[in-house]
């Protein structure tokens, strides 16, 4: 009985990816959507371990609503019909970028907007109202999405 259980455990563990403890993710996916808009808007910038796994809620972070020019840019490119979207994206995905790269909330939002603006020529590849429009390495250089 113990051999069967051990065998099942080995099978399960074989399917789990081991991530370098210094890197909780390997690249980023830029997701867009047409939720509440006729045009594609930012959904989020998501740290990824591989094409099917991503870290989330890596660190307990507080959310401070953007102000000034950042708020203007976010309303233009990251339109949030649901007022909790920005907070959700920061706490779920941005917290992992803060954990690994020590970036703050404003840097997370500004980086996401910059990558979106650099990727608008790729929007025509989207075949649905939500898609991954581009992938970036850890230095924010465009890479092929896997």
Segment roles from a protein language model:
Residues 17-80:
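Betabetaalpha-Me/HNH-type nuclease active-site subdomain
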């Amino acid at each position: 009985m113990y051999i069967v259980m051990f065998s099942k455990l080995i099978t399960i563990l074989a399917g789990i990816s081991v991530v370098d403890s210094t890197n909780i993710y390997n690249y980023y996916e830029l997701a867009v959507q047409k939720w509440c808009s006729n045009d594609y808007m930012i959904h989020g910038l998501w740290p990824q371990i591989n094409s099917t796994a991503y870290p989330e809620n890596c660190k307990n972070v507080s959310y401070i609503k953007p102000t000034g020019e950042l708020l203007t840019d976010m309303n233009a490119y990251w339109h949030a019909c649901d007022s909790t979207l920005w907070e959700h994206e920061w706490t779920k995905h941005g917290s992992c970028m803060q954990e690994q790269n020590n970036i703050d909330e404003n840097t997370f939002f500004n980086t996401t907007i910059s990558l979106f603006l650099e990727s608008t020529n790729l929007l025509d590849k989207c075949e649905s109202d939500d898609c991954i429009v581009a992938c970036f390495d850890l230095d924010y250089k465009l890479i092929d999405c896997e």
